[in-house]
Amino acid sequence: MLVEKRQQMILKMLEEKKSVTVTEIKDALGISESTIRRDLTVLDSEGQLVKVFGGAIAINSNYNAKELSVSQKLRVNEEEKRRIAKNAAAMIEPTDFIYLDAGTTTGYMIDYIKQKDATFVTNAVAHAKKLAVSGFHVILVGGELKGTTEAVVGNEAILSIQNYNFTKGFFGTNGVSVRHGFTTPDPNEALVKKTALKQCNIKYILTDSEKFDNVSSVKFADFGEIHILTDK
């Protein structure tokens, strides 16, 4: 199938459905996922659609991305995430005061952290428990607990984080885009991330390369503001 025809068919699907997944395109057109992602990247760069994690949305659609649960995320790209997490953990020094964002890749970091003298602040209940059980000094941010991501959010969390000055911060993201920045589906999580980033001296985004050129609903940082740790 010619590239132009293929891309027009993708745009036609978007016109009808407003949003479309890579799987839906694959089933409809009978082409590979890698080809689909390349087409979506091209069409996004041309301003004909917005590429998001797992698919695309129409330019004029009211998009609100659905957040995957922690258990679902754990099954996605584990090998790549662990490689990123191991490299990130090696950057922690004994005197560091660390902010550890909620997320599967930041969670994998805990398996590789060697510096027991570092102090950790996190808004992730699972991270706090794992750190404490492993003998680390950890502070769990208080606030409203979000069920799907098991992250603490809300005004109490934001006010708590504003009291700290972190030497380093390690963050997760749902989307990475030069044009749209770093994005996440949930406005409350975006506010917590944005607040924590302001309190960090050095900040890192941990992301597998599949999230590149993807866009979620809410931007929490501009591209170029943060060091990116990835698998490629």
Where are the regions a protein language model picked out?
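Glycine-rich N-terminal segment of FAD-binding domains in flavoprotein oxidoreductases
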Residues: 103
